[in-house]
Amino acid sequence: MFALNSRKVSYKNFWILSGLLVFWSCAQIGSPTGGPRDETPPAVVECDPPNYSTRFDARKIQITFDEYIVLNNVNQELIVSPPMDEKPEVKLRKKSIIIEFEEALRTNTTYTFNFGNAIRDLHEGNVLQNYEYVFSTGDILDSMSVKGSLKYAEDLDVPGEPISVMLYTDLRDSVPLTDIPLYVGRTDDSGIFSVNNLRPDVYKVFALKDGNNNLLFDLPTEEIAFLDTSLIVNADFVKQLLGDSIVTPVRAQLSLPSCCRRRPRE
């Protein structure tokens, strides 16, 4: 194992997590022939149970669209946050996505299903980007969010592939060696990431190039970035920084240090 000391190691293998924003907001709930190409992505017309439900206790979700769709690489694109021990089964039925799972859900927890770039219309391949289905097993929906960007420190290039951004309430540097995160997001083509529907808490933030898609830092070829300071996700903390006059969504920009690929200290 390596202990991180950013003053003594080269920037060659470093990433930068930058521009992090913390905010909260209220949750808001046929193929043409001829003429210009249809560039409109599929639209959701119905969800059962409804999106943004509270006191959720179902084991099956149906999301219906206004046209026939296809799922592209859904096992890799779909992010469930908090992660489930067993990935839910996702299948197509006519114009609907069916999600089924048997795993017991955590109490008083907000879950987010983010489909990334998996949902496309059948005929033109238009992508419905980052569609989210959200529910809470409790009485309220958590609405804090974290947004930011990820770049290589040496040349400020963005990663050439999606990178998992992982949040833990366990603040040990070594936690990604043994535990899956409480919340997870993923960078897009511009290195931008967003992790939504968080509960107020203090988090340790990691970015992982996850070679085997298991949300653990367990392969020698995997790369990781991590912050040596904890991230406070709390509406009252944001108000202290920006004042009560700011309307929602409220944002606070935090400075993040460079982080390296080496294994975090035990």
Identify the role of each PLM range.
Residues M1-P42:
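Bacterial Sec-dependent N-terminal signal peptides
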